[in-house]
């Protein structure tokens, strides 16, 4: 049996005393609860559930409790959703500065969120740089749009929760314990301190673990070394906790998964692998196919995308004989056109049938071609578009005839939840055309992260922050060169640098990044029995050095 990923001795007293434990993410909270269950299972038949919550979960609970209290200050108000938020920022920018691209909506939103989380106000910024002048205009319009629609931001809800604790509408906690936080915004600190007079940080028990440093030729060699090391470890003992940390895991997920899979097969190791980073829902096979089918109805698409749809198992064309598909592909290529419309595609594939008419299997395709209206002229609500999209997908045979595997079934369920979220945008009170509807649907599917449900696994692939607080028998942390660890500063271009440094805002002070890096490093050391740090000596034509924080650790060579 695998050991738990959490040292439960750190939490036993707090859980027995029914204290509130807060973590920065759901994963850490779930692992603490799981470890408590394993601990209790050996001696008890039943036990009480520990009060362990991720910070987001706890704040959501507090907000819902506040709404149940019918508090006058928030009566009739709701927290703006992520897609609503994007829409209001885009609208604020277009109304004030139509020549400015809507791509600035995200950075404007992130900047305003940081200002609020740091318990500051835009009015406090005195400098009048061109970027700041624009930003202040956008914020003014954004706040007006929220007020008009009785919406507030998440940090606004924090302020309301603080007031509830300060006015005794909420009872204070005797003690709040936090675990796994690397930094806490000032407004969140204020909220926790209002919720309890005693806020304590739980630290891992100090260990004498001495990390070793491995130098690799390049990033690919570094990943392969880590993967082979993990495979060898699991072959010698499959019942141990092994972790590989890849700082940019979310951006290199498929590559890392492929290299790890190759290493396990090379060493003849059959082992489950748990990956902390998810995939944008839009990039999963089933949902990408659905989006492609919806888009093809009213948008000319490149030949390559039509071929992807034609050979996909996720629509009615999967039942068309292969030779007919080959003939259709040749027919499309003979037109020498780069793009084809839905009608043009239907014409070619139906004409390839030996009788000269569409076979029964393609009748829905013909009906859709002949009967569907011009989407570009339709104006509907979001929920009406959701119904239309679902109808079109059903007509086009999505998600296919064959039985879905577990992964595909999870993707299908996530897609249905996404359409429900899309329908809830009706509260914007607008009707939109096909192009706008598809844009919002794509945004939602890109923002939604798909995490496959998998069984517990001995090998964990994690990002830097996801690994923090978890316990491992052996841990390998990659990407530890001097340019990457500590992280470099990144000044927000919309705010004056001096203002950011004065208030110690995110990513503006090298000493703050150094402090976070040291805290992470100490956590890895205290939560691992065996620890390796690696870095690439070259990246392209660039020569890299190990992080200065590793200078006192011995160097070793690891055999592949």
Give the predicted meaning of each segment.
Residues 1-560:
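Polyanion-engaging groove/track-forming segments
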């Amino acid at each position: 049996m695998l050991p738990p990923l959490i040292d439960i001795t750190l939490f036993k007293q707090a859980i027995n005393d029914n204290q509130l434990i807060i973590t920065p993410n759901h994963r850490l909270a779930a692992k603490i609860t799981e470890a408590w269950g394993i601990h209790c299972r050996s001696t008890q038949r039943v036990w009480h559930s520990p009060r362990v919550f991720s910070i987001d979960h706890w704040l959501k609970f507090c907000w819902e409790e506040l709404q149940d209290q019918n508090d006058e200050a928030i009566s009739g108000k709701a927290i703006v959703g992520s897609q609503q938020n994007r829409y209001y920022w885009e609208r604020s920018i277009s109304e004030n500065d139509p020549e400015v691209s809507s791509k600035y909506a995200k950075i404007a939103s992130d900047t305003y969120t940081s200002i609020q989380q740091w318990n500051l106000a835009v009015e406090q910024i005195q400098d009048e740089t061109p970027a700041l002048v624009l930003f202040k205009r956008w914020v003014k319009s954004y706040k007006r749009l929220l007020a008009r629609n009785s919406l507030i931001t998440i940090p606004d809800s924090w302020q309301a929760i603080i007031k509830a604790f300060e006015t005794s509408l909420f009872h204070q906690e005797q003690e709040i314990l936090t675990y796994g936080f690397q930094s806490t915004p000032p407004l969140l600190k204020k909220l926790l301190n209002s919720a309890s007079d005693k806020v304590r940080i739980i630290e891992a028990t100090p260990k004498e673990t001495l990390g070793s440093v491995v130098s690799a030729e390049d990033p690919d060699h570094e990943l392969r070394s880590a993967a082979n090391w993990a495979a060898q470890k699991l072959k010698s003992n499959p019942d141990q906790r092994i972790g590989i940390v890849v700082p940019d895991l979310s951006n290199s997920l498929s590559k890392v998964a492929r290299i790890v899979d190759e290493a396990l097969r090379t060493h003849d190791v059959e082992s489950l692998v748990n990956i902390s980073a998810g995939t944008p829902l839009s990039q999963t096979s089933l949902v990408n196919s659905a989006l492609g089918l919806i888009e093809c109805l009213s948008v000319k698409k490149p030949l390559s995308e039509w071929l992807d749809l034609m050979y996909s198992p996720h629509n009615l064309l999967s039942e068309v004989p292969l030779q007919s598909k080959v003939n259709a592909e040749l027919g499309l290529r003979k037109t020498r056109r780069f793009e084809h419309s839905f009608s043009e595609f239907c014409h070619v594939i139906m004409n390839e049938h030996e009788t000269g008419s569409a076979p029964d299997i393609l009748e829905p395709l013909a009906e859709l071609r002949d009967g569907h209206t011009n989407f570009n002229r339709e104006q509907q609500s979001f929920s009406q578009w959701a119904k239309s999209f679902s109808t079109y997908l059903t007509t086009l045979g999505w998600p296919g005839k064959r039985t879905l595997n577990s992964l595909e079934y999870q993707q299908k369920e996530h897609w249905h939840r996404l359409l429900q979220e899309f329908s809830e945008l009706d509260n914007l009170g607008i009707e939109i055309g096909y192009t706008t509807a598809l844009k919002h649907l794509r945004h939602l599917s890109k923002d939604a992260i798909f995490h496959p449900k998998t069984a517990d696994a001995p090998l964990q692939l994690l990002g830097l922050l996801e690994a923090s607080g978890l316990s491992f028998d052996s841990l390998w942390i990659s990407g530890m060169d001097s340019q990457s660890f500590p992280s470099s500063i990144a000044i927000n271009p919309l705010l004056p640098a001096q203002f950011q440094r004065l208030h110690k805002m995110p990513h503006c002070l090298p000493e703050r990044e150094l402090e976070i890096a040291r805290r992470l490093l100490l956590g890895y050391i205290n939560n691992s029995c065996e620890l390796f740090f690696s870095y690439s000596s070259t990246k392209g034509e660039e020569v890299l050095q190990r992080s200065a924080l590793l200078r006192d650790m011995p160097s070793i060579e690891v055999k592949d």
